Each structure stands twice: as C-alpha cells, then as structure tokens.
Amino acid sequence: MEVRRNTFPKEEHLYGQTAVDMLFRKGKSFLAFPVKVTYLVTTDELPVRCMVVAPKKKFKHAVDRNRVKRQLREAYRKNKFGLQDWAVSHEQQLHFSMVYVGDRLMPSNVVERKIKVALEKLLEKLG
C-alpha cells in the first residue's frame, strides 16, 4: 500500500514564464470566492502543478500577502489528492493557479473550507 504524504514539493509548484503565460493565455477560469481558479489541461511530466497568488493591489503589506499565500498553499496541500487521482486516472496533466481576490484576511479554517469547495468545483468542471 502506498503512503500518501501531505506535502507540496517544489516539483508541484507551477513556475516559469512559459508555463505561467500559457496557463493565463489558454486556460479557463472560474470564481469560487475568495479565489479565482485558472486551469489548463496540458502535457507535462507531473500530474498536477499549482501556483498561488496574493496580489499587491489588494494587500499592500508583504506580511499580509505572505500569510494569504501560506494559507492557500496549506489548504491545497491538505486537499490535493482528489485532483491527483483525477489526473492519474484520466492520464492527463493539470496546471492551475489560485489567485486570492478577497480584500480581507480570513482565518485559516475558513480559507481551507473555501479552497476545498473550489477544488471540488474544479473537479466538477474537469468532468
């Protein structure tokens, strides 16, 4: 039996100008407040790659942006297995981003609950 670890290693981070540009140019998006999710089914070596964004326009202080990004990463890390299972079973690769669009800080448990809903909505859209 394979043990699943709740980690978010660097290989699962979506970065690099070409990958990010392609995601925002060709990807589809939806709003699941407080995040806007943009996703793209692609050809890549890893099943799922994710990027989190906290815009400077909404949060002027770096400490607030860092808190939001930490909350988003933590919520994704705990709830990522549904997406990974979908990608493996459909033999697809998925790139997606979560952009925090709320203008207020929220407690971590609320953010996690909302991210869980956003990830379920993403799975629903993927089919």
Please place each PLM-identified region on the residue numbering:
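Positively charged, solvent-exposed patches that mediate nucleic-acid binding
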Residues: 1-127
